From Swiss-Prot:
One of its GO terms (biological process) is oxoacid metabolic process. Its EC number is 6.3.2.2. Participates in the detoxification process. Induction: Up-regulated by cadmium and cu(2+). NCBIfam families: glu_cys_lig_pln. The gene is GSH1. The Cys-178-Cys-398 disulfide bridge is known to modulate the enzyme activity according to the redox status. The oxidized form constitutes the active enzyme. Changing residue 341 to S: Decreased activity. It holds the Pfam family GCS2. This is Glutamate--cysteine ligase, chloroplastic. Disulfide bonds join 178-398, 341-356. Residues 1-55 form a transit peptide.
Amino acid sequence: MALLSQAGGAYTVPSGHVSSRTGTKTVSGCVNVLRMKETYVSSYSRTLSTKSMLKRSKRGHQLIVAASPPTEEAVVATEPLTREDLIAYLASGCKSKEKWRIGTEHEKFGFEVNTLRPMKYDQIAELLNSIAERFEWEKVMEGDKIIGLKQGKQSISLEPGGQFELSGAPLETLHQTCAEVNSHLYQVKAVAEEMGIGFLGMGFQPKWRREDIPTMPKGRYDIMRNYMPKVGSLGLDMMLRTCTVQVNLDFSSEADMIRKFRAGLALQPIATALFANSPFTEGKPNGFLSMRSHIWTDTDKDRTGMLPFVFDDSFGFEQYVDYALDVPMYFAYRNGKYVDCTGMTFRQFLAGKLPCLPGELPTYNDWENHLTTIFPEVRLKRYMEMRGADGGPWRRLCALPAFWVGLLYDEDVLQSVLDLTADWTPAEREMLRNKVPVTGLKTPFRDGLLKHVAEDVLKLAKDGLERRGYKEVGFLNAVTEVVRTGVTPAENLLEMYNGEWGQSVDPVFQELLY
């Protein structure tokens, strides 16, 4: 869920057109977003400037930075933001093809090797401090608590239940992405093994109850924990007991964004099936192959799902902004504190009518933070996030970005995907989204099984990687067997559970240990 910043602190809106329901709105010659309304500073920018909030102190090679998002004092408002500014903000993500990058994020469960119990916060703090000291990462603090690390354009952050997340740098090739993952896992293991800590690659916590999971000292999570039970029955499980792997990809124009968004939504259930890896809850099979995916169906319907409006003829940056304006907020960040704004909308904020901050107007930083609290199967920021896959072992951490890069970064392959899915109805897309977490590639679809569609899709992904010319096809080996057999990783785990594991989930902590 962490933000992956794909560029520096200044952003430009490319020349061209941003479509609008009311006609075509021209975004004139590279309007600088900084100049449009205010100084915009990315939450994860390396150029954070501060007053009191971003105290930086050198301790040897270490640099300590305050918690993200800590930038409201660095933002100088000149006049109020408008809806058009928010549209232009998304459009500022457009990049020419040679500047497209791959950003991979993954989460994992830390546990005590001797007891299999989840890591406590004090153990996580020790781990983070040791990684910072040994491998020269900057510490990220919230108050006096360490909550993450930064190094260049990479960051390590903590999910609400202590899940350990790497948000990778934007990289050019899958070889670089996989090397980044390997380097991260080496560093984490080097410290964790000395502490008797292991890390598990799964989509859902297989053994422990919700109340067994420690909570992290992050203000935004306190607000979310209080709000989640009001809007769904599984939101706290999403926060505390799930892990994902996702890839963040670029687009060249509004038209390119629309094509990738539609392809990503249509094929997201196939990614969910290929990477399904969460069949256990509290020590027993839970009836799902991807419990993590199912959990999102009863977390908060205001901010999740398959976004059928993306397939409307009128869809574009403007329509996504209108959607996001009406998704209830979680918080705003003011004076070093998270302000509870749950149930209120950014549309109210834009009008200066936010009950939690009466009379105040939003900054670009507020908008960026709000966009990170929306959780559809594909999410739009200034790049696109493919969000349908369970966490898994390291080979699958490299396979997930390979799958989507192959499908979305080659124009001919992308067109083939759009042709393949063009006549899928909203009801069919919703059916796949809801049934795949239970039946995986064996989900009936039209005249056959989803497995048969996945065979065609995997071939397209391989073709797309071949044509990139970087010898990246091998990264799909981890899912090739899944497609060939129609047997998901979760089904393999269930077979071991019912066989050699003697109906115990404990061996999974060794089987899927990083």
